[in-house]
Curated annotation (Swiss-Prot):
This is Chorismate synthase, chloroplastic. GO terms for biological process: amino acid biosynthetic process; aromatic amino acid family biosynthetic process; chorismate biosynthetic process. Catalyzes the last common step of the biosynthesis of aromatic amino acids, produced via the shikimic acid pathway. The lineage of its organism: Eukaryota, Viridiplantae, Streptophyta, Embryophyta, Tracheophyta. One of its GO terms (molecular function) is chorismate synthase activity. Signal peptide: none annotated. One of its GO terms (cellular component) is chloroplast. Residues 1-57 form a transit peptide. Keywords: Amino-acid biosynthesis, Aromatic amino acid biosynthesis, Chloroplast, Lyase, Plastid, Transit peptide. It comes from Capnoides sempervirens (Rock-harlequin). SUPFAM superfamilies: Chorismate synthase, AroC (SSF103263). It is found in: Plastid, Chloroplast. Its main location: plastid.
Length: 447
């Protein structure tokens, strides 16, 4: 009995190498396929009656290998949020734990942030039962309540200079005009929500702390060494609206932001982030170095333009003998480094010292000053952008940076323990993968 093969056309057929069309490719036609038929194989071709529709789907909304986070929503849609997959079960979490970081990120919190009024109240819809994670996907959602779509009527046709308006059109041929869609900083709500959970797990398991603060606003730069990273606290960072732990420089930064805010302009700045009590051994050699993972995570945030780790670019002015972190043994017999120009990571792997890095944020691109631009029809015009926007993004970027760093660290920690258990198991239902249970994990046995 002869076999039968049916084919479905894809863009007029299958590709084969040729030079007849000048591009190096041509296509099998239906007659070519019929010529392949013989007594044992019969090929029938069904013609496409309706025109093909090419659907473009945006990717890149998911992050992480084990602790995976997918964000969703747009600035002027019904809401924003995230779905977290891979969270360890039986860990205590509440909406209040997440809300505290969302409050640090939300708009309208001070005169130097966007005046948009959103409470950003989160709700957990799945993955948590009786206050504990279940191991299934966790869905966290935040509604949008203060949209003003009419503010973006001019941007429907004109591109904001240095904004994603133009590149979204270049890539997709269509975009969400109101609020910039996915390019809006409201997308980061999902990241901050997931990061709040990640920070709590890191703290419970290893005592790991992630703290970020503003170290530069426009031309006001916090001097190196003025902040003690060994003792820095969240209370110091949150003591003022710009989130600079030094009160004197905080006032200077606020004044610099105010000066451009009243003119409808904007400025950029730098966020410094430190990680204390990071377990040794996180990260991998070559492509998955810990600093590479951190750089990718932080550079995925809106408005980021630079990343510096450890000694950063200033290290290029030193010799090897000046830059090397010499080892010693401390009073507890633990191998440490006397200096930390490596920034807590060597060879792509954490060494147990404080990890430190800096992220540069550009000035907000949507400003209330007249600028030259073009329309979608390529007409050159002048644009004064309306809407409510931050005169400087760095005060609200602080919890965003902390979130992305925490997501990387937890994902790397779980990868490190991929062949064991992150937390103590339920002995009534599970068998241990290892006879050794860390003291930190054992402390959560009652969870």
């Amino acid at each position: 009995m002869a076999s039968s093969l049916s084919t479905k056309p894809f863009l007029s057929g299958s590709r084969r190498r040729s030079t007849t069309d000048g591009s190096g490719w041509s296509y099998f036609q239906t007659s070519d396929l019929r010529q392949l038929s013989n007594q044992s194989v019969q090929i029938s071709v069904r013609r496409q009656t309706a025109p093909l529709k090419l659907v473009v789907q945006a990717s890149g909304s998911s992050f992480g290998k084990v602790f995976q986070v997918t964000t969703y929503g747009e600035s002027h849609g019904g809401g924003v949020g995230c779905v977290i997959d891979g969270c360890p079960p039986r860990f205590p979490i509440s909406e209040a734990d997440i809300q505290s970081d969302l409050d640090r990120r939300r708009p309208g919190q001070s005169r130097i942030t966007t005046p948009r009024k959103e409470t950003d109240t989160c709700k957990i819809y799945s993955g948590v039962a009786d206050g504990f994670t279940t191991g299934s996907p966790i869905h966290i959602s935040v509604p949008n309540t203060d949209q003003r779509g009419n503010d973006y009527s001019e941007m429907a046709k004109a591109y904001r200079p240095s904004h994603a308006d133009a590149t979204y059109d270049f890539k997709y041929g269509v975009r969400s005009v109101q609020g910039g869609g996915r390019s809006s900083a409201r997308e980061t709500i999902g990241r901050v929500a997931a990061g709040a959970l990640a920070k709590k797990i890191l703290k419970a398991y290893a005592g790991t702390e992630v703290l970020a603060y503003v170290s530069q606003a426009h031309k006001v730069v916090l001097p190196e060494g003025l902040v003690d990273h060994e003792t820095l606290s969240l209370e110091q960072i949150e003591s003022n609206i710009v989130r600079c732990p030094d009160s004197e420089y905080a006032e200077k930064m606020i004044a610099a932001i105010d000066a451009v805010r009243v003119k409808g302009d904007s400025v950029g700045g730098v966020v410094t982030c430190i990680m204390r009590n990071v377990p040794r051994g996180l990260g991998s050699p070559v492509f998955d170095k810990l600093e590479a993972e951190l750089a990718k995570a932080c550079m995925s945030l809106p408005a980021t333009k630079g990343f510096e780790f450890g000694s950063g670019f200033s290290g290029t002015f030193l010799t090897g003998s000046e830059h090397n972190d010499e080892f010693y043994t401390d009073e507890n017999g633990r191998i440490r480094t006397r200096t930390n120009r490596s920034g807590g990571i060597q060879g792509g792997i954490s060494n147990g010292e404080i990890i430190n890095m800096r992220i540069a944020f550009k000035p907000t691109s949507t400003i209330g000053k007249k600028q030259n631009t073009v329309t979608r029809e390529r007409e050159e015009i002048e644009l004064i952008a309306r809407g409510r926007h931050d005169p400087c993004v760095v005060p609200r970027a602080v919890p965003m940076v902390e979130a992305m760093v925490a997501l990387v660290l937890l994902d790397q920690l779980m990868l490190q323990h991929a062949q064991g258990n992150l937390f103590s198991i339920n002995p009534a239902l599970q068998e241990p993968l290892s006879e050794t249970v860390s003291s930190a994990a054992a402390s959560l046995q009652g969870v």
